[in-house]
Amino acid sequence: MDPRRLRVICHIYRWHEIFAAMLDFNDSDLRFLVETVATERRDHDHIINLVRDKDDLLEPMLQDPELIRRLFEHEQNLIRVSPYFLFTVLLLQVRRDLEERAYVLEVDFKGKRIPVFQAQAVTDLLGRAVIRDYLADMLASFTRTNSGVIYWRERGAWHKRRFSDLDVDDMVDLARIIDPEMRPALYKRIADIALFLSGIFPDHLTLFAARHQSRFSAKRTLKDYEQQGSRFFRVAAQETDQSR
């Protein structure tokens, strides 16, 4: 996770406080976890029932590095667990890796990778369960995207538009026409897209910064995505507060 993404992620905590949904592991996740960590026990069903929904028991088990080794030992193991479980384990591994480093590589707005001595800041961030859970859930949401066609009536005329929940412009347009009470969820999705693209594909986004942009161009730079993500996280939280 590039440290500059911290400017976007700083608004996640507020959002997660408002929309704190139960992010639970499913039965297959728990079985894989128990089989991997509790190797000296045979009463796996009992342990699964014991640790279910118990964060204080699950947390140390999720820290076991053996989970990473076993997950990638066989491809079949990757489909045994949910994307949310997989990304939770991966984020914990990233945190362990960063504990041994003084810097992380940051992609600047020209596409150049430079060392930034903020590894500790990222480590501390991933040490906060509420942030880590949000990131795991957000990353999992991009393993399967949705698209479709929507029809709506505006100013006496019917309109038709195809939408994808991986496209910022689509989500902005959809937020404009849906009921106000549904907008915070779409604002969150817009912010998630910005965070995902700027954090996972910064090299791709910075290509746009080096190109000449006409005043009609809809291309966004890395900086644009960062600013947009931060703004929509903030708006989502504010509008949700007002609707309460």
Predicted region positions:
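Polar/charged low-complexity regulatory segments
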Residues: 2-244
